Each structure stands twice: as structure tokens, then as C-alpha cells.
Amino acid sequence: MSNTRKILITSALPYANGPIHLGHLVEYIQTDIWARFQKMRGHECYYVCADDAHGTPIMLRAQAEGIDPEDLIARISEEHQTDFAGFNINFDFYHSTNSPENKHFASYIYTQLKEQNHISRKTIKQFYDPEKKMFLPDRFIKGTCPKCKTDDQYGDNCEACGATYSPTDLLNPKSAVSGATPIEKETDHLFFELSHFEDMLKEWTHQGHLQTQIANKLDEWFESGLRAWDISRDAPYFGFEIPGEKDKFFYVWLDAPVGYMASFKALCDKTGLDFDEFWKADSTTELYHFIGKDIIYFHALFWPAMLSGAGFRTPNAIFSHGFLTVDGQKMSKSRGTFIMAKTYLDHLNPEYLRYYFAAKLNSRIDDIDLSLEDFAQRVNSDLVGKVVNIASRCAGFVSKKFDGKLSQAWSDSASTLYQSFIDKSETIANLYEQREYAQAMREIMALADKANEYIDETAPWVLAKQEGKEAELYESVSLGINLFRVLITYLAPVIPTTAEKAQAFLQVDTLNWTDINTPLKDHEITKFKALMTRVEIESIEKMTDASKQDMKKMPPMKPEIKEEASNLDPIADEITFDDFAKVDFRIAKIVNAEQVPEADKLIKLTLDIGVGERQVFAGIKSAYKPEDLVGKLTVMVANLKPRKMRFGLSEGMVLAAGPGGKDLFLLNPDDGAQPGMRVK
């Protein structure tokens, strides 16, 4: 086609330290649908990805398993690619950041930035594990928060009060690797001076390359000033040594996005594609990154600046998506909703999930929810009950009554109905293009309803029993099969395996937007075989049960401080009843909850305690969405001295259990409790 586009698409690189789960698959399914759609439209499109295979966690896990990091990442890569293939994620090339191509481009970009004085050297103080003889990343240090005195907090921020700080500010710090008390040591680190690119980034972020919500968030970061980015790590470290340096390695987040270039370069070397055509500064090709909203800082600031500084093109757009919840809550190991890709594939058809995600996804960064009950109902209703049902209702008559051949002649009304389906093609194509998949699915299902209404009205099962109705029957079932062909073509980016089966049934060479303009007339089809079966609730239950068992078998995903006995907090020192009686616990109703933009972990709560309202800042953002909290009852400390924070005055504290992060659980009183009641 004359307006053929050249498009390169990437997904964020999965970390080579664990298995793929359904939360990961939101992104890969979203991207794969878009790539398949572009190819169906006749564009020259390439979809590449790779394992993110460097960093301290990989080094430590390999040590724990007694193997080399290279062996670990090779095994994980094979597991990842098996999972992706199971869900029909069709990469044109899948690579690793631990590759010669990635080493070349990471070193080249660094050298270009250094020659232009965008790299600086600074002496910093860092915690050092004297037992392991290694500098400790922030997340590998735990201790007591210097602000709220909560124990077992990470080295960069407190999940209880939301405070951010330097690891050296922690009280009673411990190495999460060995449990030893770390010592402070000076070390030289290399920094990328991001502020040198502030003007360029301010312009780039407001040229339509980002979603509006993301661009607005970046404005907040611009207001607070762009800080230099530490791009080096000290040995021992699994990664690439920095050119011209001894025992200094590229931080994993420097070479991770470079993996997009490396994977495409490997594809170019394999197929003869021109790498420079897609990556040179004045390239007219298109480059798109699909990522989660949690890594936007690296992709929308550091990455464009690195590319620009090194003389490469910047992305046409970065598409961010939200997170996945299951049954309205975070994925849970105890409930069996933290579901691994392999576990899902052991029990359910991957096309079910591809369709369900498509029916939920749009171009915004909102989180999406996998309601397991709705999942079964929607797949059974839409795919099985509407789309596949059209073919099964008509195909038998074509085979038995008309030797498997579709009719040659159509009435004007039949042609008009068919054309109404074709007239929707550009609307649906535009929705795919804009990543408004949910709306596209609604448009397609509205057409499916229309097709089923036609079959109901013409009632071929009745016509088949009446003499002299052969022509009407022939048109009814032939048009029904043609309408099915249009629908399955529109759905092909979402359910490719089902589309392939339908293609074989229809005996057509391709399914694409152009071919459906011409209906199948006087065309032979094969005998119909079931294209998809219903979702059974029993299969879902078996999957969640298996997921609970999976969690018991899995090694820890994050390092924990070694403890002699238990991971539970020890029982605190004994107090008297009089001490306890001083604390005034009250039932509180959450009447409002909102984000605190300046804080990573805090939610601002307005609490009704019966005798008035209180404002409390709670460090529960990692575990709850504000809109899910409104109307809930909880327990608060009502007589805690108000504490002035930079976000406002906190007039108490709500009670929650759990170690922190996603594992936080607000206390909820039993039914009958009322705001203001004292807990005693």
C-alpha cells in the first residue's frame, strides 16, 4: 500500500529474576494486539523485547542458587519466552541486555555523553556490607525510619509515614543481604547531568509524545528541578564495566532501555534490516514504547535525554498503562489471585485473557480489574455466545444443504447489511490505532448482536423445514458466515489462534481489513469444528488453588534480613494497663481519601469520629487506592499529638497490620460498630 508505515514497537523488559505473572501480561498483550493490528493493516512493523538481565538482585540470586548469573538469566529467559509464546505474544525478536549489542550501545551512548561533558564524577558516602564486601543499594538496606521510628523500612523511603531520606539517615541499619551492620564508606560515582537537557525535555514532553496525565506529572518534577542521575555501581556487580573505569559498572537502568536498540540491532543483523534507518536522529520511521506507569521517570526523562545527547532519534510516543487488580484488590498470594502465566496456561485458554484485557484496556493510565466472575461471564457471552455462535448456527446448513459452498447471489437487503459491517471498519481500526481497545470490542460486539438478530429473524432452522424456502435459507446462512468472517477479522489482533482456526474453516488465505471488502460468494468452506469452548468456573477455581500452592514453592522474590527465628516482629516490652489506657482508640469512618502528589506512599484521609472530623496522612498508598477506601470503617488513635508534615497537619493515626508495601491491611471493625465508639 502506498501509505505503508515503518514502525518499531517495544514493551518494557521483564526482569530476569522471576516468572511472568498476569500483571506483567497486561502490557505484553496490549502491545502485541497493537503490533498485530499494524501488520494486518499492511504496515512494516517490528515488535522487539528482551530480558532485563543485570543488577544486584540477579547476582545475589545466582549466588544463592550456587550458579553463575549467566546460567540463571539463560534459564529465566527460556521460561519467559515459553510463557509469552503460550499467550501468543508474537515478538519479531527477543534478546537479552547481557548481549554484545547492548554492551556496544551502552558504552557508545556513555562515551558520547562524556565527550559532551554531560557526565560528572562525585564522591559519595554509601553503606558497605563488611561481610559480603559490597556496597549496598538502597533497597538492600533496612532499618528504623528516622522520622516516625517504624522498624523494618527500606533505605530510601518509609512505607509507614511516606518519608524519603538517605540510607545513612536510617536508625539501626542492617544489610538485607547478610544481616550485618553496614559501615559508611566513600566511593566515586558517575552521574548523568539530566539538568543539561531540561529545555529539550520540557519541549519534548509537551509535543504529544506522552499521555496528558503523564505530561502533567512530569511538570511537577520539572518544578522541583532535575537532579543528576547516578549511573554507576561498584563491584561486585553483574553488568557491564564502564569504559575507562576500574570496578565501576553501568547501573541497570542505564543499559535496560538501551536493550530496545540492542534487540533491534540483533534483528537487523539476522534479517538485513537497516538499523540506522530506524534510529538515526532524522529518522522518518516510527518508534513506540509501551510501559507501565511506574517506570515513566526513566523512559520520559532519562531515555530521551540519553538518546538526544548521543545523537539518536527520540520516540514518537511512550504509551503508559495502569496496574492489574484481581476482584477489586491487589493480586494476593493467600487468595490465589497472584497468578503466574504458566499456572493460567495449565487451566485456561490464553485467548480468554487476551480478550478480557482488550475489553478493559484504553489509552489512559487507569488500573484495570480482572473480576474472575465477570471474566467467565464476558468471555462466554461475547466470544462463545455471540461471535463463534454465528458460525456454528450457519455452517451445518451450508455443509448439509449446499455441499459446503456459499451462495453466489444476494438480495439488496443482504448486501446492505453486509456493507453496514464493512462501514464500521475504519471506526474500529481507528480505535485500535488509538489503543481504545475496550471501545473497539464494544463496537465489534454490537455488530455481533446485529448478526445474531439477523439469524434469529431469518430463522434458518425453520426455513430448512419449509418447502420452497431454499433460496432464503441459502442467503441467510451464507450471509451469516460472511458476517462471521468480518467479525473474526476485526478480532484477529486480539484472538489470533481462534482467527487462524476460523481462517482454516473459511478456507481463505488471509484475514485483513482489505479482503473483507469483497464478500465470499460461490466459495467453499470446510466442515465446522468448535473454535472455542466455554469458560468453566471449576477451571478458574483450580487455577486459584494451584496459585496458592505456587506461592508456597517459590523462592523469596526480594532479599530479607536474616533473622534467627521468625520474620514476625518480636513482642514489644511489657507495659502496664495504665499505659495502655492512655491510648484512645476510636472507630472512624473514612469520608474522603485522596492522593498526596508530593508523597510516594501517603494517602490523605478525612475521618468521621462521631464528634467531628480528623485529617490523617496514612502510609498505605502502596496497598490501597483512595477511591476504594471511602465509606470504610477503621480504627484510629484519636489522642495522638498532631504532627505537622510538609503536606499538612496529621491529626492521628489509623491502624494497619502487615510488613509494609503491598502487604498492608487496614483494621476493620465488625458490623454494628459506629464512628466515635471507643475500642477497649
From Swiss-Prot:
EC number, UniProt record: 6.1.1.10
Nucleus among keywords: no
Main subcellular location: cytoplasm
Motif ('KMSKS' region): 330-334
Signal peptide: none
tRNA-binding domain residues: 579-680
GO molecular function: ATP binding; metal ion binding; methionine-tRNA ligase activity; tRNA binding
Keywords, comma-separated and alphabetical: Aminoacyl-tRNA synthetase, ATP-binding, Cytoplasm, Ligase, Metal-binding, Nucleotide-binding, Protein biosynthesis, RNA-binding, tRNA-binding, Zinc
Binding positions for Zn(2+) per the UniProt entry: 145, 148, 158, 161
Motif ('HIGH' region): 14-24
Domain of life: Bacteria
GO cellular component term of the entry, any: cytosol
Cofactor stoichiometry and binding remark: Binds 1 zinc ion per subunit.
Cofactor: Zn(2+)
Subcellular location: Cytoplasm
Alphabetized NCBIfam families for the sequence: metG, metG_C_term, PRK00133.1
Function: Is required not only for elongation of protein synthesis but also for the initiation of all mRNA translation through initiator tRNA(fMet) aminoacylation.
Family: Belongs to the class-I aminoacyl-tRNA synthetase family. MetG type 1 subfamily.
HAMAP family with a match to the protein in the record: Met_tRNA_synth_type1
Description of how the protein assembles with itself and partners: Homodimer.
Descriptive protein name: Methionine--tRNA ligase
